[in-house]
Every structure is written in structure tokens, then in C-alpha cells.
């Protein structure tokens, strides 16, 4: 089994896609050990994606792409500018606020970086902001998306760990807001030190105009969250409704979405969904082998020999995820490793909802750290900024995010307050 894990890492570093590498290693293990046949492996893989809740993933991805292509991102950016553009930090705060608002529609960090990134960086460049700060802040602010509902990573975590997605959505809201506030504080000090310009304060008329233009877009998270918690529809149905609503805005209300553009959006959605589905298939069969070999129990026993103190275990798990997140794609870690860490956390009384939000925040910090740093690569491409410049700009912004991660890990009330208040979770 250890050889299989090292084999998988070897294939991963050689450039093989995560899903293919997992399937290849799993099939090789089954053949070499004369275990159950290939037919069983195929059944496991198909069973892994035969899940109604996972249908939320392509619909949320589709919603994000529709919002990007329908001109909605510019409306959100202008609304954020009218609210906080006059505060010291100006376009830095606008960048963060726009990411927070957009996160309620897409739920994906990379969709945020790719959709808002170009607009945010151009605006900051025009205002004489340096590329390292503009690009670094754009990358850092995009991690708010996977925490604030709706969130694709939270849906995936809920499926693989059998945890309530509704509770996870509520649990991620406060940590997402904390990340927003922490980044704004750091942005304030950096902008003040560098002497960046501050926009004039928008008048009430201008604020109302920008709100009017963005209002229907801002209703998207209200429809999603309100529908779920009023019992009108499930998270999967909410994702489908949000896609239809985004399509309605782009074609009927704003009339900015063309047929050719819609076809391209569908292609991008299929490509993204196929990558996720392939990973889920690979993780399902590989996870079955890992479970059969009792690796999760061995891992739990090992951690418990070090300490049975929840805070010590959370520290060790966070360090492990931060280390692995620097060179392994975050979605792969979420699918492969996190489900096996949940029993370790549960063994010492750590709530799975609290653990899930903490783990996803940790993994999102991982997409900001080189050499993997997927958000850095996306921002580098859309903003035409050298990778080393982005790395220099994002490093000081990791400090407030680490502080938020520590607060979330130590104080579960940040994650469990809203689920307990609105859902009676844990009672």
C-alpha cells in the first residue's frame, strides 16, 4: 500500500492528471495483488459519481461562468467601488468586497480569480497600484469564494464525508467574512504605507445607481440560501435554479449573452466538471483500497499516539495540509486525504462541520503558496503578471489568512454558531 501511495505521488509529479493517476495506481494494485477484478473497480468508480448531491457541482460551475460572461462582474465591481472606494486602501478594499459579493454566486476560487481578476487588476493598474500588490490581493481575495455559500468545495466535502451541506454552507459564512475583514486590514496598512490614491466618495445617487444595476445579480445568493433553508429545494436543486437565474439575467434582463458565448460556457463547464468527476472516480476506487487496508485506522492510531488533545491534533493536521498543499492540487487533497482525517478528528471530539470548514480554508491558502499555487497561475495569466512578482505580493497577505485559520481552528464557535442558531445543529 505504501508503494502505491509513492507510485501515485511519482505519477503526479511526472505530470499525469490526478484522476488518471489515482485510477492507474488503483488498477495496478488490484492486478498485482490478485484482488477483486477490474469489473468491481469499474463499479466502484461509477458508484462514486452516481450521487445526486454531486450534481450541484456542474450547476454551480455553470452559474459562475454565466455570471462572468454576462457582464455581471463589472456591475458587482462598480457597486463595491461605490461602497468602499473612498476608504484608505480604496481599490484594495473594492477588490476584496467584490470577491465577497461574487463568492455568493460562483462558490469557486479560480472562477473568482479568472472572472473578476482581469477587471480588478486593470482598475488597480490604472490607479498606479503596483503589480505585486494588485495581483497578490486578487489571488488572496479569491479564497473567500469557497467559504461563503454556495461553495463547490463544501459540497464535495459534504458528499465524501457524509456531512450536512446546509450546515456546512452556514458554517463557512463567518470564516469567509473574517478573511474579508483580515485582508482589508492588511490592505489598509499596505496602501497607506505605499501612498496609493483614494477614490472620491460616491454620492448617495451614485451608490443607489450602482446598487440598482447590481441588485438582480446580488439576489443570486439570496435565492440559493433562502431556498435551501426555507425548505423549498435541496442544495442540488438550488444550484440548478441559480444556473437558470443567471441564464435569465444574461439573456433577458441584461441581454449580454450570445448563443456562441453560451456554447463556450457549456464547453468550459463540461471541461471543469469532467476533471472533478474523474477525480471522484479515482478517489472512490483508491479510497476503497485504502479503507480495505485499514489505512485510516492506522492513521488515526498514529495521531492518537502523539496526542489525544484536540488542539494538538488540529495543529498537526493543519501543518500536514499546509505542507502538502504547497505541491499537491487542493481538490485532490480534499478528495483523497481529508475524508481519512475526519475519523481522526472525530476520535477526539472535533465536529465534522467545524473540521470541514477549517480544512477547506487551509487548502484554499494552499492555492496561494508556490510552487503549486493554482490561483497564482490563474492571476498571472489573466493579469499578465510574472509569477515571481505575484509570489512577492501575496506573501504578506498570507499573514492575516493564517491568523484567521488559527482562530477558526481554536474557536469552533466561529463555524458552529450559525448552524446551531438556524438549524439546531448538534442539539
Curated annotation (Swiss-Prot):
The keyword DNA repair does not apply. GO terms for cellular component: plasma membrane. The keyword Endoplasmic reticulum does not apply. PANTHER family: SIALIC ACID TRAP TRANSPORTER PERMEASE PROTEIN SIAT, SIALIC ACID TRAP TRANSPORTER PERMEASE PROTEIN SIAT-RELATED. The gene is siaM. InterPro entries: DctM, TRAP_DctM. This is Sialic acid TRAP transporter large permease protein SiaM. Belongs to the TRAP transporter large permease family. The complex comprises the extracytoplasmic solute receptor protein SiaP, and the two transmembrane proteins SiaQ and SiaM. SiaQ and SiaM form a tight 1:1 complex. The chain crosses the membrane at residues 11-31, 52-72, 82-102, 140-160, 165-185, 214-234, 246-266, 270-290, 301-321, 322-342, 348-368, 394-414. It is a multi-pass membrane protein. It is found in: Cell inner membrane. Disruption phenotype: Deletion mutant is unable to grow on N-acetylneuraminic acid (Neu5Ac) as the sole carbon source. Keywords: Cell inner membrane, Cell membrane, Membrane, Sugar transport, Transmembrane, Transmembrane helix, Transport. GO terms for molecular function: transmembrane transporter activity. Part of the tripartite ATP-independent periplasmic (TRAP) transport system SiaPQM that catalyzes unidirectional Na(+)-dependent sialic acid uptake. Coiled coil: none annotated.
Amino acid at each position: 500500500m505504501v508503494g502505491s501511495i509513492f507510485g501515485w505521488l511519482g505519477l503526479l509529479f511526472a505530470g499525469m492528471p490526478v484522476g488518471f493517476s489515482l485510477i492507474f495506481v488503483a488498477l495496478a494494485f488490484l492486478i498485482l495483488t490478485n484482488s477483486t477484478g477490474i469489473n468491481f473497480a469499474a463499479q466502484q468508480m461509477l458508484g462514486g459519481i452516481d450521487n445526486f448531491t454531486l450534481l450541484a457541482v456542474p450547476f454551480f460551475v455553470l452559474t459562475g461562468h454565466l455570471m462572468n460572461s454576462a457582464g455581471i462582474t463589472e456591475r458587482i465591481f462598480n457597486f463595491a467601488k461605490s461602497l468602499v472606494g473612498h476608504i484608505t486602501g480604496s481599490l484594495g478594499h473594492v477588490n476584496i468586497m467584490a470577491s465577497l459579493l461574487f463568492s455568493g454566486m460562483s462558490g469557486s476560487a479560480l472562477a473568482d480569480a479568472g472572472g473578476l481578476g482581469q477587471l480588478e487588476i486593470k482598475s488597480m493598474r490604472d490607479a498606479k497600484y503596483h503589480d505585486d500588490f494588485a495581483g497578490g490581493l486578487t489571488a488572496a481575495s479569491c479564497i473567500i469564494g469557497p467559504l461563503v455559500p454556495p461553495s463547490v468545495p463544501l459540497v464535495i466535502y459534504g458528499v465524501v464525508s457524509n456531512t450536512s451541506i446546509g450546515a456546512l454552507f452556514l458554517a463557512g459564512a463567518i470564516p469567509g467574512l473574517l478573511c474579508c475583514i483580515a485582508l482589508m486590514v492588511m490592505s489598509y496598512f499596505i496602501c497607506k504605507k505605499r501612498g496609493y490614491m483614494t477614490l472620491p466618495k460616491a454620492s448617495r445617487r451614485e451608490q443607489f445607481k450602482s446598487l440598482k444595476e447590481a441588485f438582480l445579480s446580488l439576489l443570486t445568493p439570496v435565492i440559493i440560501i433562502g431556498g435551501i433553508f426555507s425548505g423549498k429545494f435541496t442544495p442540488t436543486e438550488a444550484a440548478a435554479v441559480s444556473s437558470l437565474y443567471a441564464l435569465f439575467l444574461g439573456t433577458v434582463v441584461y441581454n449580454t449573452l450570445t448563443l456562441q458565448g453560451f456554447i463556450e460556457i457549456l464547453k468550459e463547464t463540461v471541461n471543469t466538471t469532467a476533471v472533478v468527476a474523474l477525480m471522484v472516480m479515482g478517489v472512490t476506487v483508491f479510497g476503497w483500497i485504502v479503507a480495505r487496508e485499514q489505512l485510516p485506522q492506522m492513521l488515526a492510531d498514529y495521531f492518537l499516539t502523539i496526542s489525544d488533545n484536540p488542539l494538538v491534533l488540529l495543529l498537526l493536521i493543519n501543518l500536514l495540509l499546509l505542507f502538502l498543499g504547497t505541491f499537491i492540487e487542493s481538490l485532490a487533497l480534499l478528495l483523497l486525504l481529508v475524508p481519512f482525517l475526519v475519523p481522526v478528528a472525530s476520535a477526539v471530539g472535533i465536529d465534522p462541520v467545524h473540521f470541514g470548514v477549517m480544512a477547506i480554508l487551509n487548502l484554499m491558502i494552499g492555492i496561494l503558496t508556490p510552487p503549486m499555487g493554482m490561483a497564482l497561475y490563474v492571476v498571472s495569466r489573466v493579469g499578465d503578471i510574472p509569477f515571481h512578482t505575484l509570489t512577492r505580493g501575496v506573501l504578506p497577505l498570507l499573514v492575516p489568512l493564517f491568523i484567521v485559520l488559527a482562530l477558526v481552528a481554536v474557536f469552533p464557535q466561529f463555524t458552529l454558531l450559525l448552524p446551531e442558531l438556524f438549524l439546531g445543529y448538534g442539539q
